[in-house]
């Protein structure tokens, strides 16, 4: 109780000295607080937009349902209604890297105005507006403070990697994850779809690939993928598939053994098995598969992995070793040959390649347009941006690790502070402009739909804010009360996000955690959303 | 996929060499595997007991509902029914430390026999029986292996501490926690009810105590407590309240300021405020409060905390400092005086005191009957058992810590291995017989009902097995496949327990996590259970 009072005073002091006075996460770029506080009754807030959009309609309906978590318990209101007027200046719904996500929000007595260039900026504004509605438990009432906000993200790529290979993640859980990412203003879902242990993606061209799934019922159909892409679009979240090759390819070989290298000495670790790149049929296979899969996504980027290739397996496979000798290839040459061939496929499917930083570490010259996701270290990142590549930071944001930054806190959840401290430009002295953002990763060796939420939240909030807010927004003590409000709010929305300090979060009596999305899109909605 | 195969072979090898061939957690003392495997159809297993017991009836109904998680999806069975015949030799339902929890289980073609001294041993046997029923996803079928098991726990005190002070834990969530503890054969719920930040326990004698609760709706009534005690009894789980005094007492002072010491220099940390023991009214208050509360519990033990007393606060309070001078008391003397007075109350309410090890560290001579819960270290434990006290191990089992045993794993969940390795007798050379068990602790600074399951499970399974199984059952690699089955099974039962390695756990399509118990007891059932 006294700790609560201390936090309360901390917030009060923050207001007095003008720092982060709003409980909004990620913290907006510009905030100007007014003097009025407007009571709002459940059901009294209506959203009206100046444009017709199937995609944005879903977003408006979603937030209208989220504004008042305890509305079922309230008396019907006789108060007047408030209209949140949304002005969107362009009806262009193109969702690609670099779209304008800015918005402005003005709350005054009698006037709620949200303005944005496009629907995606408006979605960010709706989330901020939702967070401004404060619930008072003792009075069972809601209010909103008068405020003027002007906001836009620091980085255009605010990604989250979901691994649906180490454990199968049902489609509904992936949609549920998207809810949580959208609430936190992440804008990119990096879908690590397949890996050494499992190939859960259905292919019409190569139906035996899903023999590499954990179970016939643990697979993603084309319809599943399209639903995920459409659902993500209702949050302004791009979806980028990863097919991790040439390493981590054992699961490809369950249905198509000829695709993978044979190396008994390495086979005890399933992660050691790469594709057999000596066989031209392998490249035909990749070409055909990606030609089938890529159109299910709308994004210009396509992730081809490239990490942790075990070239020793290639050398142990006589056919591959002979081919390398014949070609006069070192292992680096062979890896280079693979990446060069992959570029041909990327061009034919009209996609820009993303890889992990491993090919570069291995001496491979990547196509200069390749986007490099750095999981190794800040010094590797410095070299990569100096070489002119655009890059994503991931090394600091491994949510699976016990000690992500080698810091030891008392509580495991306090690792959020390490994520928060990891500014993408830390120790980067030159070419920082080549860093276009970053990605949190939740590798799934010890994750399935049951524990994903709690292992990710509230810790990933620190990453979300780092990627969106100004670099100067970096105080743990100022962030803490804001995150406290937000994590409680996430729980009420059905996202399992625990607390970071002793406090009280009133929740709905009938709250259950469903591992399902908050909105069910119909087939016709999916079609409308994808075609716009 | 290949990793799965490796695990499969590991299990096969274990069977061949006779080690832990059953996927049962905690592993039983004696197992003899037969040669037959019996197919069982959903709904076909009936349980029949030779005694009438309201308490055991709840347990039988519960398990009957749990045997077939996918039964709703199955065709009605035309197979024959199987009768699990339960023989209980005594109808004595006394639930106290040291009751006989042994059972034997014999599964043969046409005969399922569970035998136990009392209903609590029979409950352990039902849990083992449940774990023996194996689900085959591809065939959507169930089977059970022929086996003969004779089992009993290594330690009589297998406890779990739940902190409902740092965050309020709704009654339904405490009942849900009891489900998870019962499934894992924990037998003691140590309910850390109040602490510095909150006093959520309603008192009819002192109604202002709940002014120290986070909210008027964040409290436990007498009825709530009795429901918890009755519900725990349906799992053979004892419930022991902790009222942590004389330190950590700030929340007592919200409603009754005269109870607590005043020390401005220490007040910045709410944990620093102890009771004012110079005031005789404090002891009257404790006496009256405990006289009211103790009868709500049926256990002979009562935990009075005693940890982290900040005597500096006493010395800064002029009234207390003057009283100490008058009495000629050092701080140790004052602490001794407090514990001596507490013993008088314990005697009057007919309870045996438990404290944390701090009074002993402080030089206090505790009543020799005091049970000491050691949270500091193994060397302290050695000294305490050498002094003749009975003791509980807790220091190795702090579930809140990032690095519980200062070991760094790659994944946070792998800290289960540290818990598993922590044998209570590690580094104990003498008087190990004074260790009567141990307790996992889940302190709640960063825990509420939303994230408790995932932060506790599957890691606490390692503790459950350490306290139940033979000391020689200590191989991580042999435990892993068993825990893999069990954690999947926990999920299907509604307990959020994640995986420890890449695998596939088929779950019900309609599975939701409710933070509620699997059984709702009626008021008349609660009365019947408590009165037996």
UniProtKB/Swiss-Prot annotation, chains A, B:
BP GO terms, sorted: carbohydrate metabolic process; glycosaminoglycan metabolic process; N-glycan processing
Predominant location category: other
EC class (word): hydrolase
Keywords: Glycoprotein, Glycosidase, Hydrolase, Lysosome, Signal
PTM remark: The N-terminus is blocked.
GO molecular function: beta-N-acetylhexosaminidase activity
One GO location term (cellular component): lysosome
Signal peptide: 1-18
The organism's place on the tree of life at top rank: Eukaryota
Active-site positions on this chain: 308 (proton donor)
Compartments where found: Lysosome
EC number of the protein: 3.2.1.52
Reaction equation(s) it catalyzes: Hydrolysis of terminal non-reducing N-acetyl-D-hexosamine residues in N-acetyl-beta-D-hexosaminides
Family matches, as SUPFAM superfamilies: (Trans)glycosidases (SSF51445), beta-N-acetylhexosaminidase-like domain (SSF55545)
Subunit comment: Dimer.
Annotated function: Responsible for the degradation of GM2 gangliosides, and a variety of other molecules containing terminal N-acetyl hexosamines. This enzyme plays a role during the slug stage of development in the maintenance of pseudoplasmodia of normal size.
The family this protein is said to belong to: Belongs to the glycosyl hydrolase 20 family.
Name recorded for this polypeptide: Beta-hexosaminidase subunit A1
Name of the gene encoding the protein in the UniProt record: hexa1
